[in-house]
């Protein structure tokens, strides 16, 4: 497929512009309201250590890394992230929010969300403090084993969408499944996202799944290839419209580089720490304030 000769970030900016100009106005579960389109695709090269951390406004890099590692450890207690200064799950883990969606659990217990499904699919969820060692299907371990043993497989798929558990989750998965592909010694990842908040969520998700691909490539001795992002409902919250109109006027800058530099033995994805990743050359435009709709 021919590459867009423009900066790859224009894919994101053009999609935002398209939604602002053509999106259907809808009310949503948060009560904020959105402009929405259905069906979109973006592709980002990860070759030569390229890391597609958007530059037209600052993306919370530490949050990207810490949340991904939180998922890879199978953790579900938002307070683990909050202690690291990452508060992206704080609203959804609040006791009041949990009660509002019919969940009676301790503050911060997010339920069987992404990490639980990735590492223990099919296990019975109890609490965020329970041990699930050896329980359920470890989809991440299975995917890594398949990449090593049968890289041509078309079945290297990980799903966070478990209908049995949806009612127990603080928030059902927005990014519901991903698939790995190995071609010519390069690992690529395609992710399907049923619901994409273009202001806050999607820039974060692009970086998160790119990082996941880079990490798994490191573990399997491959080179990172490409991240492909499929979106179902791609939307702009109405209270983000002015901020995004400002953002799409900014010219993209060069994407930074990301290097995996482990500070100790890292044989499994859950062994990695924030300090094992080195971000070089990130020079974004200033942050733009946007509210989170919970």
Swiss-Prot record:
<comment type="pathway">
    <text>Pyrimidine metabolism; dTTP biosynthesis.</text>
</comment>
<dbReference type="GO" id="GO:0032259">
    <property type="term" value="P:methylation"/>
</dbReference>
<feature type="active site" description="Nucleophile">
    <location>
        <position position="174"/>
    </location>
</feature>
<feature type="binding site" description="in other chain">
    <location>
        <begin position="235"/>
        <end position="237"/>
    </location>
    <ligand>
        <name>dUMP</name>
    </ligand>
</feature>
<dbReference type="InterPro" id="IPR036926">
    <property type="entry name" value="Thymidate_synth/dCMP_Mease_sf"/>
</dbReference>
<dbReference type="GO" id="GO:0004799">
    <property type="term" value="F:thymidylate synthase activity"/>
</dbReference>
<feature type="binding site">
    <location>
        <begin position="154"/>
        <end position="155"/>
    </location>
    <ligand>
        <name>dUMP</name>
    </ligand>
</feature>
<dbReference type="GO" id="GO:0005829">
    <property type="term" value="C:cytosol"/>
</dbReference>
<dbReference type="InterPro" id="IPR023451">
    <property type="entry name" value="Thymidate_synth/dCMP_Mease_dom"/>
</dbReference>
<feature type="binding site">
    <location>
        <position position="197"/>
    </location>
    <ligand>
        <name>(6R)-5,10-methylene-5,6,7,8-tetrahydrofolate</name>
    </ligand>
</feature>
<dbReference type="InterPro" id="IPR000398">
    <property type="entry name" value="Thymidylate_synthase"/>
</dbReference>
<feature type="binding site" description="in other chain">
    <location>
        <begin position="194"/>
        <end position="197"/>
    </location>
    <ligand>
        <name>dUMP</name>
    </ligand>
</feature>
<dbReference type="Pfam" id="PF00303">
    <property type="entry name" value="Thymidylat_synt"/>
</dbReference>
<dbReference type="GO" id="GO:0006235">
    <property type="term" value="P:dTTP biosynthetic process"/>
</dbReference>
<dbReference type="InterPro" id="IPR045097">
    <property type="entry name" value="Thymidate_synth/dCMP_Mease"/>
</dbReference>
<feature type="binding site" description="in other chain">
    <location>
        <position position="205"/>
    </location>
    <ligand>
        <name>dUMP</name>
    </ligand>
</feature>
<keyword id="KW-0489">Methyltransferase</keyword>
<keyword id="KW-0808">Transferase</keyword>
<dbReference type="InterPro" id="IPR020940">
    <property type="entry name" value="Thymidylate_synthase_AS"/>
</dbReference>
<dbReference type="GO" id="GO:0005739">
    <property type="term" value="C:mitochondrion"/>
</dbReference>
<feature type="binding site" description="in other chain">
    <location>
        <position position="29"/>
    </location>
    <ligand>
        <name>dUMP</name>
    </ligand>
</feature>
<comment type="similarity">
    <text>Belongs to the thymidylate synthase family.</text>
</comment>
<keyword id="KW-0545">Nucleotide biosynthesis</keyword>
<protein>
    <recommendedName>
        <fullName>Thymidylate synthase 1/2</fullName>
        <ecNumber>2.1.1.45</ecNumber>
    </recommendedName>
</protein>
<dbReference type="GO" id="GO:0006231">
    <property type="term" value="P:dTMP biosynthetic process"/>
</dbReference>
């Amino acid at each position: 497929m021919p590459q867009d000769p423009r900066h790859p970030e224009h894919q994101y900016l053009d999609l935002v512009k398209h939604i602002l100009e053509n999106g259907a106005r809808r009310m949503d579960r948060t009560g904020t309201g959105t402009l929405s389109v259905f069906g979109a695709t973006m592709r980002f090269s990860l070759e030569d250590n390229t890391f597609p951390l958007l530059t037209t406004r600052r993306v919370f890099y530490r949050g990207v890394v810490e949340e991904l590692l939180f998922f890879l450890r199978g953790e579900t207690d938002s307070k683990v992230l909050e202690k690291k200064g990452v508060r992206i799950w704080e609203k959804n883990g609040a006791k009041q929010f949990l009660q509002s969606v019919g969940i009676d659990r301790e503050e911060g217990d997010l339920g069987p969300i992404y990490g639980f499904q990735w590492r223990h699919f099919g296990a019975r969820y109890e609490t965020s403090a329970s041990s699930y060692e050896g329980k359920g299907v470890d989809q991440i371990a299975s995917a890594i084993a398949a990449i090593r043993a049968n890289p041509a497989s078309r079945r290297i798929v990980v799903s966070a969408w478990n209908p049995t558990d949806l009612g127990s989750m603080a928030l059902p998965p927005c990014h519901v499944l991903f698939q790995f592909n190995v071609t010519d010694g390069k690992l690529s990842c395609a992710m399907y996202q049923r619901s994409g908040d273009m202001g806050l969520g999607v820039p974060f998700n692009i970086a998160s799944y790119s990082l996941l691909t880079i990490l798994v490539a490191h573990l399997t001795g491959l080179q990172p290839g490409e991240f492909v992002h499929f979106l179902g409902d791609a939307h702009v919250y109405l209270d983000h419209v002015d901020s995004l109109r400002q953002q799409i006027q900014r010219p993209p800058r060069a994407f930074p580089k990301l290097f995996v530099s482990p500070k100790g033995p890292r044989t499994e994805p859950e062994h990695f720490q924030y300090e094992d990743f080195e971000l070089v050359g990130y020079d974004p435009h200033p942050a733009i304030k946007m509210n989170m709709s919970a």
